[in-house]
Amino acid sequence: MQRSPLEKASVVSKLFFSWTRPILRKGYRQRLELSDIYQIPSADSADNLSEKLEREWDRELASKKNPKLINALRRCFFWRFMFYGILLYLGEVTKAVQPLLLGRIIASYDPDNKEERSIAIYLGIGLCLLFIVRTLLLHPAIFGLHHIGMQMRIAMFSLIYKKTLKLSSRVLDKISIGQLVSLLSNNLNKFDEGLALAHFVWIVPLQVALLMGLIWELLQASAFCGLGFLIVLALFQAGLGRMMMKYRDQRAGKINERLVITSEMIENIQSVKAYCWEEAMEKMIENLRQTELKLTRKAAYVRYFNSSAFFFSGFFVVFLSVLPYALIKGIVLRKIFTTISFCIVLRMAVTRQFPWAVQTWYDSLGAINKIQDFLQKQEYKTLEYNLTTTEVVMENVTAFWEEGFGELFEKAKQNNSNRKTSNDDDSLFFSNFSLLGTPVLKDINFKIERGQLLAVAGSTGAGKTSLLMMIMGELEPSEGKIKHSGRISFCSQFSWIMPGTIKENIIFGVSYDEYRYRSVIKACQLEEDISKFAEKDNIVLGEGGITLSGGQRARISLARAVYKDADLYLLDSPFGYLDVLTEKEIFESCVCKLMANKTRILVTSKMEHLKKADKILILHEGSSYFYGTFSELQNLRPDFSSKLMGYDSFDQFSAERRNSILTETLRRFSLEGDAPVSWTETKKQSFKQTGEFGEKRKNSILNPINSVRKFSIVQKTPLQMNGIEEDSDEPLERRLSLVPDSEQGEVILPRISVISTGPTLQARRRQSVLNLMTHSVNQGHSIHRKTAASTRKVSLAPQANLTELDIYSRRLSQETGLEISEEINEEDLKECFFDDMESIPAVTTWNTYLRYITVHKSLIFVLIWCLVIFLAEVAASLVVLWFLGNTPPQDKGNSTYSRNNSYAVIITRTSSYYVFYIYVGVADTLLAMGFFRGLPLVHTLITVSKILHHKMLHSVLQAPMSTLNTLKAGGILNRFSKDIAILDDLLPLTIFDFIQLLLIVIGAIAVVAVLQPYIFVATVPVIVAFIMLRAYFLQTSQQLKQLESEGRSPIFTHLVTSLKGLWTLRAFGRQPYFETLFHKALNLHTANWFLYLSTLRWFQMRIEMIFVIFFIAVTFISILTTGEGEGTVGIILTLAMNIMSTLQWAVNSSIDVDSLMRSVSRVFKFIDMPTEEGKPTRSTKPYKNGQLSKVMIIENSHVKKDDIWPSGGQMTVKDLTAKYTEGGNPILENISFSISPGQRVGLLGRTGSGKSTLLSAFLRLLNTEGEIQIDGVSWDSITLQQWRKAFGVIPQKVFIFSGTFRKNLDPYEQWSDQEIWEVADEVGLRSVIEQFPGKLDFVLVDGGCVLSHGHKQLMCLARSVLSKAKILLLDEPSAHLDPVTYQIIRRTLKQAFADCTVILCEHRIEAMLECQQFLVIEENKVRQYDSIQKLLNERSLFRQAISPSDRVKLFPHRNSSKCKSQPQIAALKEETEEEVQDTRL
């Protein structure tokens, strides 16, 4: 970053913001980068501001029982706030003085006041000086208030983040990430823009009093007629506002429903394509969109009338103010034009400034109260540790997670009852789940000495993770004692990867020890994986390690835990995603050898691990089922295997235990998710809700249990979207995932394989947040690239095609040599995304406008209609203006003129009625024309939005995965949320306002030019200067706004990342470290935002200076060239003053339109994406009636055809090569093999070897070369839909969308209820579905959060059974699966798919033994394709993974299955029960 010119700027330069000229000049000539941004002043740094506010808040907490955050803010910012408020007031007062001088100028042209003609020139000079003074007062005041608002936001940002890291887990249970992001974005952003309006709450009453006094002097009592109309108008607008809020609240629920389905579609786009559900999802979303648009139109019409009321109120304010006076005393031009000027100021104050100020205070105080509530929440309590303790002791410990699951079922009950489900089933369902809290752990006792290994086992929901949480202090015991040293290291069950390099993730801010680091890398089997990356361990990992396989993420998380030197290591199921061989090697080399002298607690269900543990603790229903050694376990608990394996399944648990399990499940995922989606409750909820957050959580568009990665989209309403947000989505060559799978691990669909030797990111470092956060934002450093990997620095050289994931990488400090790649990944909120800066121009192109206009043919005619009506309005206006400006000489005899009267009456009493009728007629005409003009425009623009949404949705669903892999899932969702919201809400009204303002200005200039042609000469250079200045500023401002948005993303991403890894972060004691990272992210954003505010104020001042020059020219031309006639001078000067304010408004509106049209550009970019191949590429042999059916014919009870394809399921693969993107490195090379009909093939290979990629290639989800044939039909001879329907798919990443059970099983509604029930019974789902009210019509929300992971897998299995597919693809179906569900899946595979070809990717040896052939994948290629006997006889991975004793028994197991030798199986079961139960139990 460069040193800011502000530091050495003079007072004049600061006053006129001239110090911003270098950045404006540079932005006009070239593309700006973050390195071009100036450093922030030290007073604006997050460290200083947060320390200042935190000190005052602590003082408030210590001194009062009811602390108020507003008091702390007042002590920090009050005096500067009031100083700028007084400047703002003085600037507003000048507006009231200007009409007085205008009246004197008009009066000087009275033929009877010729002696005053000589002072007209001085009055003109005074009038111009007032404009100059107003400019010099208002702009510094507005900028100062924006600056204070920015400082308040920064200070509260920091305070909230620090508090978040301290919150207790029980409080975090009731707070979703969506609520926190809303607190930081929607609420705190009000201070940035709103603080400048806050002072009008007291300025407007004073201004109104002053103006009414001046108007009273002119018109006496009739002045209150105009004020009364304004008050009525303000009340009318308030009523419209309430109506609009009602429509907005109704619409918010519909938007939420649409975004729920859309987000689920995006995060599971691979599954949608694999299931061929594109049309079903499109229809589902479009139906929701139709309902939403009905409410959108109603809200838009109300907003339109509200906006129109302001524009047309000017006629009636003047009319009602002057009418009573004119009827009594006649019309005096001086008074008319002075009153018009007063009314312009009065109208703005009463109808705009005061309501905005009241709304600002309402919003700001509400936000402060929410933040105050949040800051007083219960904090995390660190347990008292004894640092001299060498043992871990737990005595009679009992603990509860607070009840909270009941509210989920209450909502489910309410939501489904609203759908008129049967009430008879409610008791059946809810009686199964007690709503009372039950202990998650009861009376736990154990003691382990230093260096011992304690293995904790148990069935699903037994309390294993809760035990670790209690040791870490996250779960506070209600009874008993816990004793240990406090030096803990922790490895989570679901891997938490911090955006950054592999090295940074493992070191995690701890001092670097080369020998220890290399030892850990080797023990965790990461050497081979790291060696395949071009940058080795310095490769930048993306969102949650999205570029890695699930096994690689798990090993990095384990390596982080092992690298830390601690006394106690807590390992929560660290081997869940590892293949058998890798798991075995890591357990031996890492857990048993490298950590041999450390105390370890390992959560596992592997029998081999239990054998080698010093102590074993088996939990059952939260209680200690057994504690002792393995030999004691065999002797004392002969039934331990059923308890350990969980044969007492979830459905057999007692009601109390079920409630405890489900509560714990929600608790474990609540940090990563929002509350369940309420389909009926749409209103936003405050953080202060009857003392607890959990009562009415904010609607989420994402499910909390579906995964550990969880974000909430904070949907801004039209009233809240005050700013124009610029976003940027940088392409990343990786798997598309909005919510990386936490439970499911590696998905069947695309993922970057570690075998790829090419760069997984197209560019690892771009100058931007990544580099600038390497150093303090307050200090300038020259940064150069250093090639040594261990001390690598970051280059400032611009590199294209890097995502914000990489932008936010950096070290904590130069001195420590530590590097932390900070987070930039997200989505969940509109502020968190941004588009590829290279792909969208800094300024919206004319082509975008032209294309937008031609989207709907009616729009062109509507615009022509607007132009015609505008010409009619101008003609109508000229009638009154001409009449006033060209009044014939009055008749002395009939005139009411008196020489004693100080005011000239030009029009007779009789003719005044004639003027009155003309004025009323013209006003009514203008009002009617204005409404007729605007309504069709707004209606048509919303129709255009509807068309664009439909086209974009269709385009995304039909886009190939090679294209989607280069896009951020969050960016795609942002197009459907923020950009569509802009097209629906902001763009129509903004375009209407701009057109309205532009026509007003053009009309006023035309009238002035007609009345005084010389003025037109002054108008031409003003228009040219305006166009040039706007173009000059826009080129820079849009880039600054984009960089500001890019700088904002790390703030929210850092918050989300910190919350996801909060347990890990606390266990490692890295809170201060992450606070430093957060402050530097804030400082980076502040640098961008401060510069944007400064350049914006520079532009506003220049625009106003141009207007002042224009007004000076108009004033003196009018004074010097006008002869006799008050009317002409009055019209010209009044219109000139009106032009000044309106044109400045129009300029800002034009900039807003240009900014909003960037959303249209982004939508067009998505619409233009390529589509998947949908037609056969060459002719094939016809199957029926001489033609190949467009719809795949699948054998089922409904479709009985003579020719059915596929009939056998034979697959032939020839020279298959797969890539994620065109031109990318091959993930699989020259794969060739064949599978016989009905054969079962197992895929073997290390994690990341490409097994899942091969399954994706079968479905044509990747860029592939070569050929695959099914029953002799080549894949390039039929459509994609036909090809994919030949497969049944059971992916790791379970796809349950928000909808009924029936919709989830049969989205195309092809099957009858009876057939669905038969399949549900076959896969073991019937008992699950029947316990829900409504049964098949029960609406699942939040990714089916009320279902266990096993039940979700059964849903996928049921889909495959219904499809009657002949080829079944299974990718890790047993990952994190309870044994009961696993056994159901095995049984179903044997029965329902007995005649099908099955391709299985699995880590369980037991499941793989049922395969006839095995395909071994190594280094992108097929190494072996043989039977199990040959693999065991040769030196293979499979052989290495199985012990010799196992091998001896496996052959009999295989042979017995062939010759049906039951005695051998029985003997095997009796002799070695534990070997048969070989893997996860």
Swiss-Prot record:
Residues 1387-1481 are annotated as: Interaction with GORASP2. The keyword Transmembrane applies. Residues 1-77, 147-195, 244-298, 359-858, 940-990, 1035-1095, 1152-1481 are cytoplasmic. Its EC number is 5.6.1.6. N-glycosylated. It catalyses: ATP + H2O + closed Cl(-) channel = ADP + phosphate + open Cl(-) channel; chloride(in) = chloride(out); hydrogencarbonate(in) = hydrogencarbonate(out); ATP + H2O = ADP + phosphate + H(+). ATP 2 binds at Y1220, G1245, R1246, T1247, G1248, S1249, G1250, K1251, S1252. Residues 654-831 are annotated as: Disordered R region. It is an enzyme of class 5 (isomerase). This is Cystic fibrosis transmembrane conductance regulator. It comes from Chlorocebus aethiops (Green monkey).
